[in-house]
């Protein structure tokens, strides 16, 4: 019965599914009917496992599963691209994705300013080039370190022309048509240096929680996924919203799939109507 009903939905609601589901790398828009439809067309059958994935226990309880895993390549390289503002960084996300990185993560000025005052990350923030307001951490996987270095060089040749990378870029490296916005870069091929970059990014929440006083960064604008090409407009609109309430937010984490962590600075000891107003306008 379940199989028949799901098949009916896919058959009768094909146009609605295709029209309404956004093109996102991470689905936060309900059940995976779009992927289920695509898989059904490819295999001429409905794989209910595709529907259960991401349903978070609302459709069935999984007691046993067989998972297909992809091996992680032996080598990886990281580059920290620096920008004069978070909007500039967001404008660079979509063209960076054309280079097929394994990760693109943002750290904005709010996070970097707080990290500057921590014992663990002060030295790292101090190495950022002058004028750095925000950064994008870009990681590539490769089958060899030579290939990893080349991927970084190809990216920098496209997104930061004139920068001298550790190796020369490929003669036929990808050149996107998008404007460039990065002001500098820090390459990382040593595992310890890479781990330091990643640790600061992954410590985003503890860094934000280090802020003293009644004003805190609260998590009610979380994981709102948007297509990466719309990130500049999305972040700019949010900045205008928070400005209208005389506050600001921290923007960090998963820029690649368009799933940002956005934590407005609020004093929950203040009048309820101010907090409610901000939340209502965002929702």
Predicted regions span which residues?
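Noncatalytic alpha-helical scaffold of FAD-dependent oxidoreductases
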Residues: 1-253, 258-283
